[in-house]
Amino acid sequence: MNPSSAGEIADYLKHGDYSLAVRRTLDYCLDTGDDALIDNAVNWSREYHVNENSKSVKPIPDNFISEAESILQQASKIQSGISYQTKPLISAEKISKTYSGGGFSLKPINVSVNTGNVLGVVGENGNGKTTLLRCLAGQLALDDGEIKYHLLQKPDPYAVKNHIAFIPQRILKWFGLLKDNLHFSASIAGVYGEKNNLMVNFMLERLNLTSYAHLTWNQISSGYRTRFEIARILLQKPRLLILDEPLANLDINAQQTILTDLIFMAKGAHNPMGIILSSQQLHEVEKVADTVIFIKQGDCLYSSNDRSEKITSNAVEFETTVTRETIIAIFGEQKIELQFNGGFYTIISPALSAQEIIGKMITAEISITYFRDITYSTKRFF
């Protein structure tokens, strides 16, 4: 983050976006590296969450705004000298993998990720998303191609494992209290004593997990297990975070919160990192990813990096109660392709823009309950 971010946080506070303001203030203070300021922000955040969980009639604790202003003022003075540059993290060139028996093969594929960037990998189950992620994480040997880990001078398996964190869809069970596991994870990363306590408390607050820290694995839902696993991994400060279907066990609100939080932290000066994630939640991933690739039967059919080369028509997905014949009549002689999957219609046109397609239907005064421009969305390939 940079000093201008203090103004963004002030706007969140002004307009009542308190949860986002708290999360971003914690990020802002973490980037300063000032332990006393971080601790102050953690305590301020804790008061906010206690008030929120108590279902108080007051949306925020007393002195919440004045304390926030004081914290931001202190952080801004330190932040003025902090900056980081985006660096290449990983690049894979024509990597491929075939499992023994020849049942499935990942076709040659190219990907690259820099610090602060997010790569989204989408596709149906069983089409190669997990295989690709495990290859990039160094968990599977390649049949062909090359992976370069740009920040490692000697990318041996041990160095790669410490450089990259991989969170699978099925997370292994934790034993003991959740908070104790986080303390242990921080100690593995060389964080001890008061600094260990500070960073664990910070991560609990940052992901809003403090009220669950005293529980055990069997006492929390699958969604919270995912969030605790993310907290555990982030304490180890990986340079590349790879997540396999992290949204599968989360509700809609938690999905977007986790994604935006990961992006915020990936771009922070404390530990700028790259993120690669797989998912079937296309809309959520496309909103946050810098690059999205679509994999089908082991082959990369689409990458948003070269979308202009493959997309020659515009497409709009929408929901309406009118008939197919009514829709066709609206466009008259203009050439369109109309598809219906039982729930949504899709209009594809090489001549009309998405705005023109929607405009014609609005002018015709037909009822539209949902629409989305999917011209450059991987939704077109499902």
Locate the predicted segments by residue.
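ABC transporter nucleotide-binding domain
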Residues: 264-275, 280-345
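Q-loop/switch helix immediately C-terminal to the Walker
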Residues: 170, 176-190
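The feature captures the beta-strand-to-loop junction immediately N-terminal to the Walker
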Residues: 122-124
